[in-house]
Amino acid sequence: MLRIAVAGGVCLCLLLPRLSRGGSSLVPPLQASSLIEHDTAVATQQPGPHGGGKTTAYSFFARAPDLQLVFRKRALHHGAAIGYHRQEEDEIYYIVSGTGELTLNGARSVVGPGTAILTRPGSSHGLRQVGPDDLVIIIVYQQSSGVRGR
């Protein structure tokens, strides 16, 4: 049986186990709750991490118990930046729209829609919005030490 509940703008979908005909075992076994979230429900205005300017952060699944993956969308508004910083875990940026200036280990390059960037532990990087449109990116990394920043 599928049960759907809406809490605080978040749709919680839970697949409940069914009893077998004999009533002695669960088929299928109980699984962790799955979530569906819309960006309008999780959007927050924030300064650019490690940098400055205005951004909108969309922290998807931040309240999901035991999720070790961070999946976020961030819109860097005019002149905003994710400041240059040293990376402590693998992190992926994917440029959805807009234009940015990426600094990766001291080298600068212009990035735009369709660009994927992998930063590895020990490397340093920063990203700044340039051009007329917001720079919209997807950020994915494995959560460490219970911190869900960026």
Predicted feature residues:
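A short, N-terminal "cap"/entry segment at the start of jelly-roll beta-barrel domains
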Residues: 18-68, 148-150
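Conserved short histidine dyad/triad with adjacent acidic residue
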Residues: 70-87
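Ligand-binding loop in jelly-roll beta-barrel domains
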Residues: 65, 121-147
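Glycine- and acidic-residue-biased ligand/ion/polar-headgroup-sensing regions
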Residues: 88-91, 95-100, 105
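Short acidic-glycine-tyrosine-enriched beta hairpin
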Residues: 107-122
